[in-house]
Amino acid sequence: MLFAFFPFLFLFLPILVWLWKLTSGEDKARLSVLLLGASLLFGACQGLEALLLLLGLTVVNYLFGLLLADEGHRRRRLGRRGLLLLAVLLNVLVWCRFRHLPALSAWLAQWQDILPVLAPAAMPAVFSFAVLIQLAWLLGVYQRRIRPEGIVRQALFTTCFPYALSGPLVRYEEMGPQLDALEVPQAEDLARGLGLMVLGLAKKV
């Protein structure tokens, strides 16, 4: 499901706006949960396997973030720099495993037929963007610019559907305040947003 597809424009988006208005009088935490649920549904439409892998990687990265944010960890055997390098290595290995190994195996299959059988399926673009977003988040935690704020917030920041599929790559410093200020948009904001969507779709025609 892409932004230009009818299921998104006439089913997913209207239902989300309706549910958003119903939840508007509640705690903002519920709006975060609603947006997370919508983002997970959107991600599942791109590929359930990639979404499950991404959620698992999000949990692992969040645990790395907790360790990096721990003030007492610098005195332990594996310092903060070592933790960061380990986290980056893990993310890069997973990213290469699912983004580049299929193409490499297809190329090598010209000489060896068994390789395509062993190769995993290629992951959608949402996986690549999310991995890069999480790497930037880990770097921000390492540099003490941000702190972990809960696994729900981390999952929402990573999978938020407006930018998870095609970018742009965002930093938590940019998105954190926006996630804190979730609210029901005014009519003029909705009209402006729909106008931008129509303009974007027109450019694709």
For the regions a language model picked out, list residue spans one by one:
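Membrane-embedded transmembrane alpha-helical bundles that form the catalytic cores
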Residues: 1-205
